């Protein structure tokens, strides 16, 4: 029974990383929603924009899910780049591979109507703060840098991607 739990956990890691690397956002969203509904409490993720607690929780979750890619990516968290600090960047060890830049946002119901607007806020922050600067300086072609906006509201999650 314990081995089955670990095997199922490995399946989640593998499914998540495969969806990420193949740019299957619908699958990525489904996996995160499944994790949220089956494994998390509102105590974990918060139901309001309480300081940075929900954002930090999801940040740690995503780091945990992608850590298995260390043999293919240099995974960096909270590094300064451009005019700010991105949440997570994945620098490919082979320059011809895709890079990923992730920004996490908690839905602010006073400023945003829905999670779609929260994702757009994440994309605006990536652009305005020029978070791609460090990746480009590292020699990664900007056309290979995929930006992911993550929006959270309690157990609700939305992830979108753009180049």
Regions of interest found by a model, annotated:
Residues 119, 130-161:
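Nucleic-acid nuclease catalytic cores
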Residues 1-130, 157-163:
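Extended alpha-helical interface modules used as scaffolds for assembling large macromolecular complexes
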């Amino acid at each position: 029974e314990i081995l089955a739990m670990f095997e199922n956990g490995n399946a989640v890691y593998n499914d998540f990383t495969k969806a990420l690397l193949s740019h299957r956002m619908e699958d990525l969203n489904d996996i995160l929603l499944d994790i949220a509904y089956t494994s998390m409490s509102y105590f974990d993720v918060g139901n309001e924009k309480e300081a940075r607690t929900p954002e930090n929780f999801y940040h740690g979750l995503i780091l945990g899910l992608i850590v298995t890619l260390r043999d293919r990516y240099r995974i960096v968290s909270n590094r300064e780049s451009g005019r700010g600090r991105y949440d997570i960047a994945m620098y490919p060890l082979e320059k011809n591979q895709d890079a990923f830049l992730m920004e996490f946002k908690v839905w602010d119901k006073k400023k945003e109507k829905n999670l779609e607007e929260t994702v757009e806020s994440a994309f605006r922050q990536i652009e305005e703060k020029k978070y791609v600067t460090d990746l480009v300086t590292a020699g990664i072609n900007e056309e290979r840098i995929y930006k992911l906006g993550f929006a959270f509201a309690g157990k609700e999650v939305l992830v979108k991607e753009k180049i």
